């Protein structure tokens, strides 16, 4: 009788199990996660270890940069541009400054154009070294970060020598650059860690001018890139984590408005430095690295190759700048500050200086769009002037915003661990995404 009574209970249990629904698991990735590369909150819908849906939440670093720029004179918003993509500072400045120059109808001197080209490429190397070290660290390769920051520190010293700041330089100005290249480089001082022969070795490349220092850097940097590739390019674990992961087809890349390495990694040869040359990119020789498969590994190879091409461009700029001294700012006191010597003798020069830094200058009415090939993609500035000394409207086109928009479409079907690799390969900085 006991067996007869238990049979209906068992069948009822089976019926209950058949009615149960399998529900996906929702996971919050960030904003405190170290691999989120900032303040990204990614809500992942998981089916076991597989991503079913990804919902990026942004805005946690929104500072109203566009509106702030509309409330200040044109020349007082350059510092805001540095704080957008705070790993690619001078490239942001370049887009904004070029937009102002277009509306005013002025052009920077040739020497200033070469300096801008050189520092754009220095900034590109800075960005890619940061990306290389942090992305490798996300995937478990810890030593690469130490190697990448070794060279990054040298270029940060160049930033500091030219502008006084290691990051937020505010070096580009409408009509040229803040000042010419210095004749000396900062040197290491004696300490209990560095003294004697070790100190001399550290300062060996810093005895001459900044151009001498950069020339030495361009001679040694290719060997440094070889060291990065020794650590990663043929590393089995690195290839297992990146080959075939995050594949973006060319049509998908174009549909989402991707630019930069995200587009070139899929095999599309679009680079503003070649297609719509600005500054002195039409006067230097370089190639555009392209991917074939559009996966994380291809984008890694593209960025490494871009560092080699940037090194070539810097070398050419250094050679030209050594042979061609000249002015780095237009001689227009309505736009450029007068020389210090003239302000001591000429009252009109003093008035120009005061008006320039207190009220700025009026820009002719009109609108323009200026874009540069930033390390992360096309960074653009759409500027409208109504003839006043402040912009009527500033709109900034951040490449990371378009790239992050595709996150849901790209990560579906991949494992949770692959999401970290894909966020890293996007090279996101939320200063520009949130603005």
UniProtKB/Swiss-Prot annotation:
PANTHER family referenced in this protein's UniProt entry, alphabetically: NADH DEHYDROGENASE [UBIQUINONE] IRON-SULFUR PROTEIN 2, MITOCHONDRIAL (PTHR11993:SF10), NADH-UBIQUINONE OXIDOREDUCTASE 49 KDA SUBUNIT (PTHR11993)
Where's it found, cell-wise?
A: Cell inner membrane
Top-level taxon of origin = Bacteria
- Which reaction(s) does its UniProt entry say it catalyses? a quinone + NADH + 5 H(+)(in) = a quinol + NAD(+) + 4 H(+)(out)
Which PROSITE patterns would you find in this protein's record? COMPLEX1_49K (PS00535)
Q: Top EC class per UniProt?
A: translocase
Does this UniProt record's set of keywords contain rRNA processing? no
One GO cellular component, as annotated: plasma membrane
Gene designation per UniProt: nuoD
Q: List, in alphabetical order, the Gene Ontology terms for molecular function in this entry.
A: NAD binding; NADH:ubiquinone reductase (non-electrogenic) activity; quinone binding
Q: What is this protein called?
A: NADH-quinone oxidoreductase subunit D
What family is it from?
Belongs to the complex I 49 kDa subunit family.
Q: Key word Cell inner membrane present in the record?
A: yes
Please give the SUPFAM superfamilies that the UniProt record associates with this protein: HydB/Nqo4-like
Q: What does this protein do?
A: NDH-1 shuttles electrons from NADH, via FMN and iron-sulfur (Fe-S) centers, to quinones in the respiratory chain. The immediate electron acceptor for the enzyme in this species is believed to be ubiquinone. Couples the redox reaction to proton translocation (for every two electrons transferred, four hydrogen ions are translocated across the cytoplasmic membrane), and thus conserves the redox energy in a proton gradient.
**Mind giving the lineage of the organism this protein is from?**
Bacteria, Pseudomonadati, Pseudomonadota, Gammaproteobacteria, Lysobacterales
Q: Which InterPro entries match?
A: NADH_Q_OxRdtase_suD, NADH_UbQ_OxRdtase_49kDa_CS, NDH1_su_D/H, NiFe-Hase_large
Predominant cellular place of this UniProt entry's protein: membrane
User: Record's Pfam families?
Assistant: Complex1_49kDa (PF00346)
Enzyme Commission numbers on file = 7.1.1.-
Q: How does it assemble?
A: NDH-1 is composed of 14 different subunits. Subunits NuoB, C, D, E, F, and G constitute the peripheral sector of the complex.
Membrane topology per the record? Peripheral membrane protein
Keywords of this entry: Cell inner membrane, Cell membrane, Membrane, NAD, Quinone, Translocase, Transport, Ubiquinone
